[in-house]
Amino acid sequence: NMVLVSRDGQQWSPPPLASLEHRADLPHTGLAQVLTSAYNGADWRRNILWVKERFFVVFDEVQAREAGDYDLECLWRSLGRVSLSPTRFTVDQAGQDFSIEGTDGAACVVREQWEGQGSNYYASYPYSNDGLVKVLRQHRRLPLQAGQRAVFSNLLHTHEGAAPTLKAERVADNAMLISGASGKWLAGVGRIDLPGVLRTDAALWLVSDSD
């Protein structure tokens, strides 16, 4: 599960090391930001916001260090029966479902991938019907000047049955509204000004209408 970055048609391996920029482990939430620097002309920040026992929100920010035409892919790997709508990727593992819902408008496709050398590596996994890895590929291609950025924003959560129990809506490139029967949450990264609602420049932030 990662972001692939290429610039002007060239792609090199990601840097071998990443830095933990921020972390917090609170009673009801967890927050983390990891930075991969100088990755094919850009910096990649993975921001993870965790509402414990409920969901994860992941913002992947790619900020250009150098101007160029960027080709970006955010990859998510899973096992089981999958379905794909324009905004949601759902995995069924024997009645236990998992969804990834994007709010950034990236084009999405699912590819099947065989793992192992000459054998089905995941054939014995009890919650995979065929042993194939299903890879969700979220794709964006765009020109970026130095300092500009592109963001992949995704809500990840589990649910019993095919119908997701949460809904994600785009508020801004760096902010998402999550709604469910148990409440609403506003999650984001970096500076935002929502008149009458929220103004902050925190690296990662999360507010709710309950706890």
Model-derived segments and their meaning:
Residues 1-211:
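CBM-like, beta-strand-rich accessory domains located in the C-terminal region of large
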